[in-house]
Amino acid sequence: MKIYLVGGAVRDALLGLPVKDRDWVVVGSTPQEMLDAGYHQVGRDFPVFLHPQTHEEYALARTERKSGSGYTGFTCYAAPDVTLEDDLKRRDLTINALAQDDNGEIIDPYNGLGDLQNRLLRHVSPAFGEDPLRVLRVARFAARYAHLVFRIADETLTLMREMTHAGELEHLTPERVWKETESALTTRNPQVFFQVLRDCGALRVLFPEIDALFGVPAPAKWHPEIDTGIHTLMTLSMAAMLSPQVDVRFATLCHDLGKGLTPPELWPRHHGHGPAGVKLVEQLCQRLRVPNEIRDLARLVAEFHDLIHTFPMLNPKTIVKLFDSIDAWRKPQRVEQLALTSEADVRGRTGFESADYPQGRWLREAWEVAQSVPTKAVVEAGFKGVEIREELTRRRIAAVASWKEQRCPKPE
């Protein structure tokens, strides 16, 4: 029996990155030997065991053979005669097909070290094309390591295109697509994930609402980058700088979906694209089974982001109504989230990356004023039932009006 550290732990250690999880491969053993040594079996489809002390995963070396469609259509073979090289060959990328023995020596049968040094994401073997989930995984790795200037090998991108055109991605379940997307949204450069999907044709298959934005022009005065798809990825990049929250980043990604519905004869203007985009947000989220809380914020951002850009022109009643519409009284975090997504929208434009966004500050200040109006005073004044809500709203509007007169510049 020989045990090797494999995969991501070896890769990230070589890159000088923090190692989160460690996975091990056991060569020359059987399930019974593992059980006799005190390991606990957890794998159903193939033999995976938990270490009795560390609870880290130890998998028997195995091979995989394509036996059906999609990413689950594989037959696994695990036996003492499966070599380490056999096990590593089934992995997706060469940089993930590295192992380390107990002496610290790196075993590298597929030139993963060379690709690490050259910052290349390259598939190990043609078997890569048998698992459509790997298209998403490579896009996610490209986003995860974009700050280290990794790029996808030409032959790997070509294979990803072939897989997409062959319809392989249609076998992916919504849950797996969202899981990979959610992971990509946590990276430092989530926009790279969607750019890679577009480069291999997968964006049109998995995110047609986003793909439809490319080639749709916006007024050059407000959008020097002109192309709405490019603007969308720029805003996502900016959102990633402003907030680590997946819901803020996803909502920013979806903020302009309505522009994809504008008839070409009306280009480059997109009047009413915000409310129009709400249905597309719902459609995308329903298809991918996006969690409700993330979906709800994306809907609100699509509907109201342009309203916040015009904040100095909003009257106090409209401002308080906005807080009602986003359910800020019960979910106050939405005010900050809306401020951040709107700021990402403004700064996600060519030449505006460092622009100030005072509307965000005014939105936050107006919220502090409105929510500081005490409900208790309204009740103590004798108002009852529906009158309480009406009087509370009136007082909030008055408070915001007083604040706006002093703090918010009047529109010219």
UniProtKB/Swiss-Prot annotation:
Mg(2+) binds at residues 21, 23. Residues 228-329 form the HD domain. GO terms for molecular function: ATP binding; CCA tRNA nucleotidyltransferase activity; cyclic-nucleotide phosphodiesterase activity; magnesium ion binding; phosphatase activity; tRNA binding. It comes from the Bacteria. Keywords: ATP-binding, Hydrolase, Magnesium, Metal-binding, Multifunctional enzyme, Nickel, Nucleotide-binding, Nucleotidyltransferase, RNA repair, RNA-binding, Transferase, tRNA processing. Its EC number is 2.7.7.72, 3.1.3.-, 3.1.4.-. ATP binds at residues 8, 11, 91, 137, 140. CTP binds at residues 8, 11, 91, 137, 140. It catalyses: a tRNA precursor + 2 CTP + ATP = a tRNA with a 3' CCA end + 3 diphosphate; a tRNA with a 3' CCA end + 2 CTP + ATP = a tRNA with a 3' CCACCA end + 3 diphosphate. GO terms for biological process: RNA repair; tRNA 3'-terminal CCA addition. InterPro entries: CCA_bact (IPR012006), HD/PDEase_dom (IPR003607), HD_domain (IPR006674), NT_sf (IPR043519), PolA_pol_head_dom (IPR002646), PolyA_RNA-bd (IPR032828), tRNA_CCA-adding_enzyme (IPR050124). The keyword Cytoplasm does not apply. Magnesium is required for nucleotidyltransferase activity. The keyword RNA-binding applies. Its cofactor is Mg(2+); Ni(2+). PANTHER family: MULTIFUNCTIONAL CCA PROTEIN. Comprises two domains: an N-terminal domain containing the nucleotidyltransferase activity and a C-terminal HD domain associated with both phosphodiesterase and phosphatase activities. Monomer. Can also form homodimers and oligomers. Belongs to the tRNA nucleotidyltransferase/poly(A) polymerase family. Bacterial CCA-adding enzyme type 1 subfamily. Catalyzes the addition and repair of the essential 3'-terminal CCA sequence in tRNAs without using a nucleic acid template. Adds these three nucleotides in the order of C, C, and A to the tRNA nucleotide-73, using CTP and ATP as substrates and producing inorganic pyrophosphate. tRNA 3'-terminal CCA addition is required both for tRNA processing and repair. Also involved in tRNA surveillance by mediating tandem CCA addition to generate a CCACCA at the 3' terminus of unstable tRNAs. While stable tRNAs receive only 3'-terminal CCA, unstable tRNAs are marked with CCACCA and rapidly degraded. This is Multifunctional CCA protein. It comes from Shigella dysenteriae serotype 1 (strain Sd197). The lineage of its organism: Bacteria, Pseudomonadati, Pseudomonadota, Gammaproteobacteria, Enterobacterales.
